[in-house]
């Protein structure tokens, strides 16, 4: 079904381009006669109908503006796709690395939690000493 819709769209685009060429020929070779004016009006009406038909059969595909800019600059849109995929690959590798580090650190923390007990009261006491005497050096035994 998608291929048939694509083919219909291509055929309609070809017809529209042919109509535009005919209009340009009529405008270029205009003599100002009534027959020429009527022919031009008829071709313009045909063009409007063809644009309406294009609007009816258009594809509902979202095209990134960057791809359109690439095409406007005469560049190959496949280059944009390749660069975008490479960027996503780098980001994916970075996030995967972060996840690996988190998994390893979680495993290390779990394996050492039984061996190294946390002394919360010692840590809280040290923090109050530091905050109450900010100008003095901390004294005491470090265990």
Swiss-Prot record:
GO biological process: regulation of transcription by RNA polymerase II
Keyword terms, alphabetized: Activator, Nucleus, Transcription, Transcription regulation
Polar residues bias locations: 124-143
Superkingdom: Eukaryota
GO CC annotation: mediator complex
Key word Nucleus present: yes
Chief location bin: nucleus
InterPro entries found in the cross-reference section: Mediator_Med10
Any one GO molecular-function label of the UniProt entry: transcription coregulator activity
Pfam families documented for this protein: Med10
Keyword Transcription: yes
Cellular location(s): Nucleus
Annotated stretches, region: Disordered: 123-143
Subunit annotation: Component of the Mediator complex.
Function, in words: Component of the Mediator complex, a coactivator involved in the regulated transcription of nearly all RNA polymerase II-dependent genes. Mediator functions as a bridge to convey information from gene-specific regulatory proteins to the basal RNA polymerase II transcription machinery. Mediator is recruited to promoters by direct interactions with regulatory proteins and serves as a scaffold for the assembly of a functional preinitiation complex with RNA polymerase II and the general transcription factors.
Sequence similarity: Belongs to the Mediator complex subunit 10 family.
Protein's name in the database: Mediator of RNA polymerase II transcription subunit 10
């Amino acid at each position: 079904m998608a291929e048939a819709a694509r083919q219909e769209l291509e055929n309609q685009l070809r017809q529209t381009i042919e109509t535009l060429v005919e209009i340009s020929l009529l405008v270029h070779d205009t003599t100002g006669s009534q027959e020429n004016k009527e022919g031009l009006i008829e071709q313009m009406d045909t063009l409007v109908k063809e644009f309406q038909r294009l609007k009816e059969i258009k594809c509902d595909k979202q095209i990134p503006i960057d791809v359109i800019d690439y095409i406007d600059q005469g560049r190959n849109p496949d280059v944009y796709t390749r660069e975008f995929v490479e960027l996503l690959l780098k980001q994916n590798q970075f996030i995967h690395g972060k996840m690996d580090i988190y998994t390893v650190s979680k495993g290390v923390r779990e394996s050492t939690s039984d061996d190294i007990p946390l002394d919360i009261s010692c840590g809280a006491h040290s923090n109050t000493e530091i905050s109450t005497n900010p100008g003095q050096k901390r004294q005491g035994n470090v265990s």
